[in-house]
From Swiss-Prot:
Induction comment: Expressed in the early phase of the viral replicative cycle.
Site residues (Interacts with thioredoxin/glutaredoxin), renumbered to this chain: 773, 776
Name of this chain's protein: Ribonucleoside-diphosphate reductase large subunit
Subunit structure: Heterotetramer composed of a homodimer of the large subunit (R1) and a homodimer of the small subunit (R2). Larger multisubunit protein complex are also active, composed of (R1)n(R2)n.
UniProt EC number: 1.17.4.1
Lineage: Viruses, Varidnaviria, Bamfordvirae, Nucleocytoviricota, Pokkesviricetes
Disulfide links within the chain: 193-439
GO MF assignments: ATP binding; ribonucleoside-diphosphate reductase activity, thioredoxin disulfide as acceptor
Annotated PROSITE patterns: RIBORED_LARGE
Reactions catalysed: a 2'-deoxyribonucleoside 5'-diphosphate + [thioredoxin]-disulfide + H2O = a ribonucleoside 5'-diphosphate + [thioredoxin]-dithiol
Binding residues for substrate: 177, 192-193, 221, 419-423, 613-617
Function (record text): Ribonucleoside-diphosphate reductase holoenzyme provides the precursors necessary for viral DNA synthesis. Allows virus growth in non-dividing cells. Catalyzes the biosynthesis of deoxyribonucleotides from the corresponding ribonucleotides.
């Protein structure tokens, strides 16, 4: 190790000069090994976030000492391994253009990674040999992904390879975990999310166990619709026996998930969905629990995620019961006796007798025919749901009718379930010409477009367009585990572009979450994201053709995503003027009018945007997750790579500006668990801006969601954060979200640790809620 090793890494050679105690670190350098020095610097993060930056640079230096010094050499060494994962075609492309790739790649950019980022890359994304030795650097991985996207087709597009590498390595965009895992390999399953619909026959029940296991082994996350499975004790005419219902089947999928881990890199990840009218609903709601009768008898399935597919009719009955306007009566059915309830939805929310409400009509038809197998109340169901949420943070809630009526692909078929993180909504079915939904994900770093004079909406639009083209190419270049997944992806060509770093944008511009300015900017950012994606998808359609299911879609009729919200009455028609004002004329009424006219001629992709969790991307780049507020100003992030201290650098910079980042403040911040609300030496304006997600009124999160949702083609992973498990508080935001037309009611509901006997249960809930659903996690 060179004499001035620490001084060099802390200097501006690798970016900005770091605010660290060099004398202290020089002494530590003498005493510690390199790995110990990394841990030592990480532990000092509480003093200043630059210590974490230095630890990251040390970790990068450590990796660079043990890996090849050029991209082509790294590929050659991997290809020479007896069990190399690299595809021969990929290796040939690298060798053919190695002079270009080797001269363009910039390994100094590795030093821009956060500590959490470089350790995550080492643990999960960088290719290893059969002995577990890392064989590449982060920049090599970014170039590998870029070549996979633009170098594996009929034409090797060098220009787009280099552009995509730049966008990835500068952390302007990120691609999903399966893309990072599998790009350039012999079996490149690049897709993140898969949606399966389980039919009520023995052959298909077991087929779906096999299919889910194969998908999971390639790194995909899975959402399964169970609403079509007949209820427990239902008669099976073919055998004369009685059905076991959904319980044993869920346990079977639970065991399959535990076995079929994602390439050994992380656990498998499945979510199961059920509609609320199903006779087995109370069994379903108890199966995730860590405590209770099923758990004690080991009849639960706590490793799965759970989701409810909630119709408007249930919410109407629940609201009436809450306000004593009705008795809350809710009928339960077995789908063999009351078929197709999960295959219809209400096109309108109106109470008018002539309203298009196919679900409501069929539901009450079956009630009149006395096909129901049980009667409960809406309150009883929601209380059972909440009891489970307290323990494990889910089941998620997806608003079935809003999802379907606002889908560009509503003409294809009813959307019966979502994916692992409830942001992907693709129709899927089994049987003749079965389709199993697939979506490829990526995200844009919103903080990359912060400028001294405001926000660069034009840059965001351009980046969104670039990601659109990337994902469209991934559809053609990826591996599909089943013919039904290939058929669906080729027919609809759905993509899901998300975001991360919204909280960083607000913090940098000194905007408070929940303020009118913040809500307007949230809307404008997602409008720009959608606009950029749609514009590029239209251009791609002119070049390559529209997706085959384009005829009959909303876009084919000149309806953009926000137009579907206007049609439903959930967005006022003047939204265009509001967006024009916020973007300072970047997006005007004319912009949207021209986009509508162009869309009628053809669109390449059936879906464009979906707001997923982005913990890994956020970890890698040092930005906050997706569209969420800061969860804390100081916390320990636990990942598969270890534990890391995360400090809110924007808060520290603001406090340093007024000479308040002192040892006393540091100690108070530590003792308060990352909250500054009771540190009265800090000005009220700063305390207000740095309220954490738990400290702000949860209606703020709902209002922000309502502002961005009209520009989301699919849905979003919308979390809520509460101090105490009070059903009234949770119901308030759920009902508000439903009334505002949200597609996702809730992803996870997080609760702070409580007191007494509840404390352990809620701590378990926190553990479950914070577990990374990394299949669609970026």
């Amino acid at each position: 190790m060179e004499t001035f090793f620490i001084e060099t890494l802390a200097s501006d050679v690798y970016g900005k000069a770091l605010n660290v105690d060099l004398d202290r670190l020089s002494q530590a350098q003498i005493k510690y090994t390199l790995q110990e020095l990394i841990s030592y610097c990480s532990a000092l993060t509480i003093l200043h976030y630059d210590y974490s930056t230095l630890a990251a640079r040390l970790s990068v230096y450590q990796l660079h000492q043990s890996t090849a010094s050029s991209f082509s050499k790294a590929v050659r060494l991997q290809a020479a391994q007896s069990c190399s994962r690299l595809s021969p075609q990929f290796v040939d492309v690298v060798y053919k253009y190695k002079a270009i790739f080797d001269s363009y790649i910039d390994y100094s950019r590795d030093y821009k990674l956060s500590l959490l980022g470089i350790e995550t890359m080492k643990n999960s994304y960088l290719l290893k040999n059969k002995d577990g030795v890392i064989m590449e650097r982060p920049q090599d991985a970014y170039m590998r992904v870029a070549i996979m996207i633009y170098g594996m087709g009929k034409v090797v597009n060098i220009k787009m390879i280099l552009l995509t590498y730049d966008l990835l390595s500068r952390h302007i965009i990120t691609h999903a975990s399966p893309t990072m895992f599998n790009a350039g390999t012999k079996k490149p399953q690049l897709s993140s999310c898969f949606l399966l619909n389980v039919n009520d026959n023995l052959e298909n029940l077991y087929d779906m166990v096999k299919t889910a296991g194969i998908i999971s082994g390639g790194g995909g996350g899975i959402g399964l619709c169970l609403s079509g499975i007949r209820a427990k004790n239902s008669f099976i005419s073919g055998s004369g026996l009685r059905s076991n219902g959904i319980q044993n089947y869920i346990m079977l999928q639970n065991a399959s998930q535990c076995y079929a881990n994602q390439g050994g890199l992380r656990p498998g990840a499945y979510a199961v969905y059920l509609e609320l009218w199903h006779q087995d609903i109370f069994t379903f709601l108890e199966m995730p629990r860590l405590k209770g009768q099923m758990a004690e008898q080991r009849l639960n399935a706590p490793n799965l995620k759970y989701g409810l597919w909630v119709p408007d009719l249930f919410m109407e009955i629940l609201e009436d019961q809450i306000h004593n306007r009705g008795d809350g009566r809710w009928y339960l059915f077995s789908p063999d006796q009351a078929p197709n309830l999960h295959k219809v939805f209400d096109l309108e929310r109106s109470q008018h007798e002539n309203a298009h409400r196919e679900f409501k009509k069929l539901y009450y038809q079956y009630v009149a025919e006395k096909r129901y197998t049980g009667v409960t109340t809406a309150k009883e169901i929601i209380k059972a749901w909440f009891k489970t949420v307290i323990q494990v943070g889910n089941p998620y809630i997806g608003f079935k009718d809003a999802i379907n009526r606002k889908s560009n692909l509503s003409h294809v078929g009813t959307i019966t379930n979502s994916n692992l993180c409830i942001e992907v909504t693709i129709p899927c079915w089994e049987g003749d010409k079965a389709e199993q939904g697939v979506c490829n994900l990526a995200a844009v770093n919103l903080a990359a477009f912060i400028r001294e004079n405001g926000y660069d909406y034009r840059g965001l639009i351009e980046a969104s367009g670039n990601v659109t083209e990337n994902l469209d190419n991934i559809i053609d270049n990826g591996y599909y585990p089943t013919e039904a997944t290939r058929r669906s992806n080729m027919r609809h060509r759905p993509i899901g572009i998300g975001v991360f770093g919204l909280a960083d944008v607000f913090a940098s511009l000194k905007i408070k979450f929940g303020s009118p300015e913040a809500i307007a900017m949230d809307e404008a950012i997602h409008a720009a994201l959608y606009y950029g994606a749609m514009r590029r998808s239209i251009e791609l359609a002119k070049e390559k053709g529209s997706h085959p299911s384009f005829p009959g879609s909303a876009a084919s009729k000149g309806l953009l995503q926000p137009d579907l919200w206007v049609r439903c009455g959930d967005l006022i028609p003047s939204w265009e003027e509001r967006v024009a004002q916020t973007t300072q004329g970047v997006l005007t009424r004319k912009s949207w009018r021209q986009l509508r006219l162009a869309a009628i001629q053809g669109v390449r992709n059936g879906y464009l945007t979906a707001l997923m969790p982005t913990a890994t991307s956020s970890n890698s780049t040092g930005k906050n997750e997706c569209f969420e507020p800061f969860t804390s100003n100081l916390y320990t992030r636990r990942t598969l790579s270890g534990e890391f201290i995360v400090l809110n650098k924007y808060l520290i910079d603001d406090l340093k500006e007024i000479n308040l980042w002192t040892e006393a403040i540091q100690l108070q911040l530590l003792n308060a668990g990352g909250s500054i609300q009771h540190i009265l030496d800090i000005p009220a304006e700063i305390r207000d801006r740095y309220k954490t997600s738990r400290e702000m009124n949860q209606k703020i999160l709902t209002k922000h969601a309502a502002a961005r949702n009209p520009f989301v083609s699919q849905s979003m992973s919308l979390n809520y954060y509460f101090y105490e498990p009070e059903l009234s508080q949770v119901l308030t935001v759920l009902v508000l979200g439903w009334k505002k037309g949200l597609t996702t009611g809730s992803y996870y509901c997080h609760f702070s640790p409580g007191a007494g006997t509840q404390k352990k249960i809620i701590r378990n809930s926190e553990k479950a809620c914070n577990a990374d659903c990394e299949a669609c996690l970026l």
